Amino acid sequence: MEDEKSFSDICGGRLALRCRYYSPYCREFGLSSARLSLCSLTAVTCAVWLAAYGLFTLCENSMVLSATIFITILGLLGYLHFVKIDQETLLIIDSLGIQMTSSYASGKESTTFIEMDKVKDIIINEAIYMQKVIYYLCILLKEPGKPHEISRVVPVFQSAKPRLDCLIEVYRSCQEVLAHQKATATSL
């Protein structure tokens, strides 16, 4: 079963939450943000190149124009490959673990997997960001020798920064899977 809903991020931008239910104990949540606009990209590139052309006409040095074009192209490629994330995905399987994937605008993907026996809980935490209180979903990891202590906090959906209403929906569904996993683990 697949479900798609529209939400907004902390800045008011549009987000699409895609929920896939493969089984009662395997769920995937994908948050997609707005793609890079060709108009805004063209406007910024033209503005930088016009400023470079203005400097070129003042100092009559063609190196200024060439360097600006080269730096703009490298900066754009770096932004698309290392910074701009189009989609973040959280896959939770009760007997296996949690996989987080970030898909960049260039097509590059970054994946992190956390085994379920290392997961203590999934919570919604709050933080102060740019003079606002924001909420974020995070995974609490167990301390290896001390199962009642937390070793690390792993934030989820760092790039998308969804609002609380979106996080609550993902949180409730994750808690259903975790509750089944804990019930299965205690019955063994």
From Swiss-Prot:
InterPro entries: GPI-GlcNAc_Trfase_PIG-H_dom, PIG-H
Protein family membership: Belongs to the PIGH family.
Signal peptide: none
Cytoplasm keyword on record: yes
Gene designation: Pigh
Membrane spanning stretches: none
CC per GO annotation: glycosylphosphatidylinositol-N-acetylglucosaminyltransferase (GPI-GnT) complex
Organism, as annotated: Mus musculus
Protein name stated in the entry: Phosphatidylinositol N-acetylglucosaminyltransferase subunit H
Known function: Part of the glycosylphosphatidylinositol-N-acetylglucosaminyltransferase (GPI-GnT) complex that catalyzes the transfer of N-acetylglucosamine from UDP-N-acetylglucosamine to phosphatidylinositol and participates in the first step of GPI biosynthesis.
Location within or outside the cell: Cytoplasm
Subunit structure: Component of the glycosylphosphatidylinositol-N-acetylglucosaminyltransferase (GPI-GnT) complex composed at least by PIGA, PIGC, PIGH, PIGP, PIGQ, PIGY and DPM2. Interacts with PIGQ.
